[in-house]
Amino acid sequence: MNSLGINIYEILFQILHITLIIIFIIFFAATLSILERKFLAFFQNRHGPNRVGWFGSLQLCADMIKILFKEDWVPQFSKKSIFILSPIIAFVSLLLVIPTIPFTPNFLIINLNIGILFFLMMASLSVYAVLFAGWSSNNKYSLLGAIRASAQTLSYEVFLGLSLMGVIARSGSFNIVDIVNSQKEVWNVIPQFFGFLCFFIAGIALCHRHPFDQPESEQELADGYHIEYSGMKFGLFFIGEYISIITVSALISTVFFGGYFGFWGSSFFWLFLKTVFFILIFILIRASLPRPKYDQIMSFGWKICLPLTLLNLIITAFFILI
């Protein structure tokens, strides 16, 4: 401890914790990309990646080597500084939410009193990555994808926040730890089912996942806003998408399904099991649902999801007041 009363070793220990968890999440996200391809192959009655290693077990290493040795190309007429900054923002934005999630009753890296607001802030920051990427690429398909992504994400963020208001009203706090502790008896998914449903839908849209993958639809926009990216820059966008899936799945498990509280006891195992379950739901949705038109996506958000979140908030307020 120095003259200012700051424990240097405790700070270094916290930094080590954060670093190890971030490395684990990045590795898990990279592995998830291969697992998704295997699951999609299973659902579509084909083999999937099976050439590198035993049953394709080394495909992740092959993909990493390929991305590392690809030319890291920058378009000639692009805005180079913004072009380079965009994948970094996409990679980092939702990754920073992970340390605010309580893993066990006794293990939490950062205890923020405004944990939910911090998540919403980071979710809003991810929009800038897409918008900057599309605009700075100087490509019409990239720009169209960025415009789609910005409009879709900003629309769905409205009820992404509103769907959490019922949970916040019940727990009386924006702190994620307080929200988890309020679910010792009953998980929030039971009294807040409509809130959970809208948050899950908005989370899919936030991750730009099927069926809300309009910004990067290959058939219409030739891969959308990151068409001009290659090498490690594309890898950051690619891994960033899976990090967002992990973050949203972990938040759903924490806010609506009791977090580390299980059917008996409380441990990291329950949080991990719930998170993996929702990740599999993401993959299953991609394998089974068609992609609707862009106007249908926007109409669904404003005409169905937004009224549903407002109705859920009114019902929650009514039961709290009585």
Swiss-Prot record:
Which reaction(s) does the protein catalyse, per the Swiss-Prot or TrEMBL entry?
A: a quinone + NADH + 5 H(+)(in) = a quinol + NAD(+) + 4 H(+)(out)
- UniProt-recorded Gene Ontology molecular function terms: NADH dehydrogenase activity; oxidoreductase activity, acting on NAD(P)H, quinone or similar compound as acceptor; quinone binding
Q: Which GO terms describe its biological process?
A: aerobic respiration
Protein keywords = Cell membrane, Membrane, NAD, Quinone, Translocase, Transmembrane, Transmembrane helix, Ubiquinone
Q: What is its EC number?
A: 7.1.1.-
| Topology in membrane | Multi-pass membrane protein
Could you tell me which InterPro entries the record lists for this protein?
A: NADH_UbQ_OxRdtase_su1/FPO (IPR001694), NADH_UbQ_OxRdtase_su1_CS (IPR018086)
A Pfam family cross-referenced in the UniProt record is: NADHdh
The main enzyme category here is translocase
UniProt-annotated location(s): Cell membrane
Q: Where are the transmembrane segments?
A: 15-35, 82-102, 114-134, 149-169, 186-206, 243-263, 265-285, 302-322
Q: What cellular-component terms does GO give this entry?
A: plasma membrane
State the superkingdom: Bacteria
What HAMAP family has UniProt attached to this entry?
A: NDH1_NuoH (MF_01350)
Biological role stated in the UniProt entry: NDH-1 shuttles electrons from NADH, via FMN and iron-sulfur (Fe-S) centers, to quinones in the respiratory chain. The immediate electron acceptor for the enzyme in this species is believed to be ubiquinone. Couples the redox reaction to proton translocation (for every two electrons transferred, four hydrogen ions are translocated across the cytoplasmic membrane), and thus conserves the redox energy in a proton gradient. This subunit may bind ubiquinone.
Q: How is this protein organized at the quaternary level? A: NDH-1 is composed of 13 different subunits. Subunits NuoA, H, J, K, L, M, N constitute the membrane sector of the complex.
Task: Please report which protein family the annotation says this sequence is part of.
Answer: Belongs to the complex I subunit 1 family.
Name listed for the protein in its UniProt record: NADH-quinone oxidoreductase subunit H
User: Source species, please?
Assistant: Buchnera aphidicola subsp. Schizaphis graminum (strain Sg)
